[in-house]
């Protein structure tokens, strides 16, 4: 048993798809890229360059994209400035934050998660969601087969997004992957044991 798992049972949180589309101005019948990238403490002087490389790779696909602002760590403000430059593209939607239940619902509906958020490692496998994990922030963490690791270079990121979106074998493996952080049923298992 692993402790403190999140219950990610889809039937418990997924709002109606049309409400999600309306709220976030998306067409979920088309590809959607979700971008969540935070500053890395020991690389804060590179935060702006790192998010720019990511967004350049994302923009090259011209798919509807949801970009969530980074956390409040050092370097986050400069990343937000850079993110806001990309709102000139009509397919880029930015949000300072998203309610947790909506975030989980987006993980259930989008085509790929891109960035360096721990949710690529911890939550995304529960949804079979392909994830492009960029840089060193999640280094050393166990991960499922849904994760593609890459560096902060737009060409590498672009190729990884392509694999996540179009490699049918990779997508099949991601869809069927086992979450190394559990299935969200720790409480039930504890009750059964007791």
Predicted regions and their residues:
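Nucleotide-activated sugar donor-binding and catalytic core shared by glycosyltransferases
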Residues: 1-194
